[in-house]
């Protein structure tokens, strides 16, 4: 029952997050529609409106079907875990690939339509625009990186509790909870470091607007990542409390741990959506926006510009995400290796639990011997 509840909650949350990020409304903003630069009059053309209506209709149907499938898959958990895990992995792959396919496919159709109709805004840029005054302004950028020592230190201090040390030495099952918690906080710390050191992006010919938007992005990223790390540390402390108090990590402990670990996801999502809304408000009031038609480098749905020295750039379709410059040496190799690693991990887990459910050792008892 607990397994059903945990995965049901995770599936519902995942579908909701994906819909908010990839399937939400796509209004005409910053001179773009679905990541494609278009004149306002072109965005109102009947064929463009029809394309976007089709995209919204298919998106709603796709997420509704996958919401129902995500609930149905969880019912298999009442039978055996290995068949459930296989079906869940298949559903997860279908859901992630389908969400990307819907978004990128429509983006490419809109780009092809733009080029066929000649709706080009200016000339494609080979290098990113720069605003030296905005780049020099670094104040008010959110919490410093040193603050991430706090959640990492809190997780490590759980090892000072005698009951926790005894549990880890005798049971060993708690190492996964505390180790994964520390890895999450270190990852959030590293992500904050990367984002805080990236160059300022130019949105406008007005330096004040550029400073406001870049300051907003760094503050939101900084605080959401730090708060997420603190809640992650709280999850580790909740598990450590059960280890020290009961010398056991049961269903209640895992449930509390899961809820506290899901709070960072809610914090990040809320922060990113709020940041995107506030950024649209700032740029909508900008009297001198900077429009650079670099759609040729985004025509496939990802960034591919050999003239740009950057490895990571702000994603065009999901502004609070980041895209790798696929024109860089090793970018494709690293992406394929990462996907292959995830695939091998999922297949390995499925095989392991299949063996545990159906191929493991058995014990038979008779009146004379075992």
Model features per residue range: what roles?
Residues 2-20, 83-103, 168-189, 253-268:
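Alpha-helical transmembrane segments
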Residues 18-35, 98-119, 186-206, 269-285:
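Membrane-water interface of transmembrane alpha-helices
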Residues 20-37, 120-132, 274-327:
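Membrane-proximal soluble regions of multi-pass membrane proteins
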Residues 46-65, 129-154, 211-237, 301-340:
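Loop-to-transmembrane boundary segments
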Residues 72-81, 160-168, 238-248:
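Juxtamembrane "helix-exit" motif on the non-cytosolic side of transmembrane helices
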Residues 79-101, 105-107, 116-142:
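Membrane-interface helix-loop-helix junctions at boundaries between adjacent transmembrane segments
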Residues 333-353:
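Internal/C-terminal transmembrane anchor helices
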Residues 355-369:
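Alpha-helical transmembrane signal-anchor/signal-peptide segments
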